[in-house]
Amino acid sequence: MDKNAHEADGIIVSCRIKPHNAFRGPYESGVCKMMVVGLGKQKGAESVHSDGLGNMARNLPANAKVVVENSNILFAIPCVENAYDETALIEAIPTEKIFEREPELLKIAFSNMPSILVKEADVLVVNEIGKNFSGTGVDPNISGTWSTEFGKGGLQVKRTCFLDLRDSSHGNANGMG
């Protein structure tokens, strides 16, 4: 864990809860991930990723429990967004309720995700990609363009075409290859 966080009188975990873009489980991108990767920095990220994405759904809450047991997490304040990236819900969660409440909030986040109205397409044309949309440039939860076998959902598409890169990505075209 980050030295400054570990030495703090208390830690309040603030984050978004949303579907992950590479795996599925009861804890994806949210409080547990913020405790393990956010507070754990590089070593936390290495620890939770060490067994590969196929074990992420198991490793993330297990590692988060170690963080809770060995630090002073006071509570968490996650938010859930709507389909327009606007805050739909903010909730304070006592530490002892994090592992119970986060999966429930993830279900709300899934139900709030935007979607493409058709389920299958031959070609998906994406106007803009960028790191601000997803680490892979486009959110596979919507586009179905998964870079891993451990994620699922979104459109079933045969070919995808990207027209432009968002300026705020500063040339980072991760997801193009």
Annotate each PLM feature.
Residues 1-177:
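Anaerobic metallocofactor- and corrinoid-dependent redox/one-carbon enzyme cores
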